[in-house]
Amino acid sequence: MARYTGPAWKLSRRLGISLSGTGKELEKRPYAPGPHGPNQRKKLSEYGLQLQEKQKLRHMYGMTERQFRRTFDQAGKMPGKHGENFMILLEARLDNLVYRMGLARTRRAARQLVNHGHIMVDGARVDIPSYRVKPGQTISVREKSSNLVVVKEAIEVNNFVPEYLTFDADKLEATYTRHAERAELPAEINEALIVEFYSR
């Protein structure tokens, strides 16, 4: 399944969750798009709830189904709770951590920064958004890219960096000090439903 590249606001309304992280998509119209508007939402079956939760998380991180399932399977081989491990692996993606650092206003914009070669890990350029960052590694912006308008604008509006990142705004770099804990990850996601979906 290909990565969704359509309007993010429309997908946010369909899934009932803000994919941009701003919440603006749902402020005026907190219902699915289309002619039926607010009357379109209906009670979902157990399978429908599981599928919806899976789609919410997959689109939140901007992944293809193949990437998403592969990460899910990898999480299943780790000790501990499958669902929590899955969330932790998703959070460790390079594009996501660039977003968490505040270098981009959305994960989609962060993915573009990585794709275009603006981001470095431990001093080496990495242009793979799905690159899994390990604790202790440092993420930074290339010197040639430090004056990008999109980066400066993003930093100006960002007022929160999670505790598992130590961010130096002057150097535009952060160290991924540890894996995130479940309490620090999206509370609106019920990962147990996703485990149930793939366990059918």
From Swiss-Prot:
SUPFAM superfamilies: Alpha-L RNA-binding motif. Keywords: Ribonucleoprotein, Ribosomal protein, RNA-binding, rRNA-binding. The keyword Ribosomal protein applies. PROSITE patterns: RIBOSOMAL_S4 (PS00632), S4 (PS50889). It comes from the Bacteria. Residues 92-155 form the S4 RNA-binding domain. SMART domains: Ribosomal_S4, S4. It holds the Pfam family S4. Gene3D superfamilies: Ribosomal Protein S4 Delta 41, Chain A, domain 1, RNA-binding S4 domain. GO terms for molecular function: rRNA binding; structural constituent of ribosome. Residues 22-42 are annotated as: Disordered. GO terms for biological process: ribosomal small subunit biogenesis; translation. One of its GO terms (cellular component) is small ribosomal subunit. One of the primary rRNA binding proteins, it binds directly to 16S rRNA where it nucleates assembly of the body of the 30S subunit. Part of the 30S ribosomal subunit. Contacts protein S5. The interaction surface between S4 and S5 is involved in control of translational fidelity. Belongs to the universal ribosomal protein uS4 family. This is Small ribosomal subunit protein uS4. It comes from Bacillus cereus (strain AH187).
